[in-house]
């Protein structure tokens, strides 16, 4: 086994997996899967690794031994005792962060609060600066409702929660848009001038 080196991705083979076949779910391996995730988190926390890359896992088998498991993001937050986490999907052309994760669609609107938006944008802004070396990130926020609520005509979340959060963040000199309509947010112009979307 090689030690941690720059420009090296180390793949660690952890044994004790029950026999498997591709395309089949084995609840008997739930503990094995969770132990692998725990090991990877521990290695990263103790600075033995510089990053953690997770592959997909079957939530159904994990839930068989941990009823509160909803996904990597929330699990890592629990293990690390972090105040806040943010899931971001990133490529060279596009970065999209999620305000909510792993909850039923019926619960999304009541989960969107001023505090949640402020917390997520602060994490996003900080990570764009520290992890992506962007000095003054430009962040655009999508509305929750069609056409960003049309000033309260198609839902009130933008007026009650999202806009007040964004006004608060602007006072802290965070370069952020007001809520955009999701159907037009990813225009060529917006893609060119935006470092990340929430």
Language model region names:
Residues 1-197:
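Anion-binding alpha/beta catalytic cores of soluble intermediary-metabolism enzymes, centered on
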């Amino acid at each position: 086994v090689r030690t941690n080196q720059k420009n090296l991705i180390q793949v660690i083979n952890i044994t004790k997996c029950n026999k498997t076949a591709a395309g089949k779910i084995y609840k008997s391996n739930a503990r094995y899967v969770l132990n692998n995730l725990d090991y990877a988190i521990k290695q990263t926390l103790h600075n033995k690794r510089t990053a953690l890359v997770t592959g997909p896992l079957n939530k159904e088998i994990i839930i068989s031994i941990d009823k509160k498991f909803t996904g990597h993001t929330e699990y890592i937050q629990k293990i690390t005792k972090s105040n806040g986490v943010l899931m971001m999907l990133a490529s060279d052309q596009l970065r999209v962060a999620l305000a909510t994760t792993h909850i039923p669609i019926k619960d999304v609107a009541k989960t969107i609060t001023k505090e949640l938006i402020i917390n997520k944008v602060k994490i996003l802004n900080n990570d764009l600066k520290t992890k992506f070396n962007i000095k003054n990130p430009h962040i655009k926020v999508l509305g929750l409702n069609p056409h960003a609520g049309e000033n309260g005509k198609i839902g009130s979340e933008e007026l009650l929660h999202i806009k007040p959060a964004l006004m608060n963040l602007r006072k802290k000199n965070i370069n952020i848009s007001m809520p955009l309509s999701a159907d037009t947010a990813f225009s060529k112009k917006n893609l060119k001038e935006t470092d990340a979307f929430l």
